[in-house]
Amino acid sequence: MELTRRNFVQAAAATAVAASAACTATAVADEAAPAASYSGTDYVDAAAEGKQPTIIDYTNVVEEVGAPDVVEAHDLVVIGAGGTGLAAGIQAFEDGLDVVVLEKKGLAGGTFPGSEGMFAVGSHWQKEAGVEIDVEEIIGRLMTYHHYVPDPELYRTFFNKTAETIDWLEQEGVGFQEVIALGESDPTWHLYAGERSKGLGAQFMVSFIARAEELGLDIRFETPAKQLITDESGAVTGVLAVDSEGKVIEFDAKAVIIGTGGYANNMNMMKQLAEVDPTKICAAGSNGRDGDGIRMARHAGAIMAPAPGTAAWYGPILYGTTYGTPVQVATSLQPVLWVNEHCERFVAEDMFFRNFPCAGMAHKSQKTVYTMLSQKFLDMYEADGVQLQVGVYCEKGIPLTTLKADLQDLIDEGNEHIWVADSVAELAEKAGLDADKLVATVDAYNEMCANGKDTQFDKADEFMIAIDEGPYYLFEVQNGYFCTVGGIKISTKCEALNENRDVIPGLYLGGMDAGGFYGDAYDAGIAAGSCASWAINSGRLAEEAAREFIGK
């Protein structure tokens, strides 16, 4: 594909749209992926046919390709043109390396356009705002939060890079607008510049891609990497890829950096590693995160880091809706009533705002989750806006003027996960739930609302509003997640490690392909924006280490 400024900017805009795919019970795998064992569709296909899928290690399956039709030689090959890959590629180009970036899609950006801001400590934005954060103190809190799964030295390496990376991004043409807290976090979340309604991450990526085009960075679109090449010693010496014409290209290289975005869309890997029912989960962002990089690294001898199944869960999303849209925010994430398959509450319903990974983890512990509200809440949200803000997508005080029309469209389209009734008992019966149990739960909840105190889960008093007048609405919701954060075990230099914990020479990983950065949950309540920040910073850290290894 010819690379022009127009293509780059169109690519970023298209990526923003792609990041808005709605979730359904069946659309949980990358439909564009080949129907083979490495595609991530096996589990869903087998389940649809009432069969058990073959039990194999999906982290170590790669596609075989034939002999190369073309051979090229470069200093560095970067796999993936998302946040991590572009950061590594741009940095490498500026450092004088002969670098090529391989991207399996026809556009750059990956799922990064779905982000809104990134974590940093010690930035000039924080200094100008009078924000002081002790690096060692926050590392201690994170290590405790993650049960000492991560490597504290990896944290130090990352944290000490974040402020300089903010400066670097601004020099590259990427802007920021402010640094704020997210829920209970410290003010570490650096929001990207731009109009919030147009997607801050998309605007970040438009600028970043434009910089890559300005430099003349060599990005090969529609050229997916298939396998790593290793020598007799186990060192990685290149990549086998296939271009859009089906030609096998051997990219010989002195080092390879992998940044393919994790495995959020690979339902085989989600089932194996996260131990979830793929029909009850929903990945936010664009498709294509099929675990390519992890699988290639595993095939080359790398091991998975502890907590390989960790994902950035955030909690409820109504089937058939898109994260951050008015109908999703109003029906799924507001502090109304959340119950499980037994019609029991299981968490304070304002947890999404307080610490959204905890909302997602609580959801993950249930078999099925429903949110419930009444007409007065829909009227309130449409007239006055939501009770809880969701990132920069739906802000408090801004009326959701199309909410009821959007919801009615879903009902008219036959969404089977929405029920409406004039009584709580009838609502339960329509949904196939125990009517007596749901009535008892609602009555107990309304009594707490009347007393102004949630004595069960300590939800904030201001959100204790009774659900006592019909029509009543019940929504079956999936558990949403932004990305997976479990991956390959790496050193503090982002080097891949083998089963002996020795470095695999020439192989580096960043972003969501690199593991060992999280425990069993995302840490937005402490380090808001750490995923996006890790994507960019690890790309640069991997490039630095690879450049040192190459000797340039």
Name each model feature, range by range.
Residues F251, A255-L318, A528, A532-L541:
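Glycine-rich loop(s) and the adjacent beta-strand/alpha-helix scaffold that form part
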Residues I294-M296, I303-K430:
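An anion/pyrophosphate-binding glycine-rich loop and adjacent beta-alpha core
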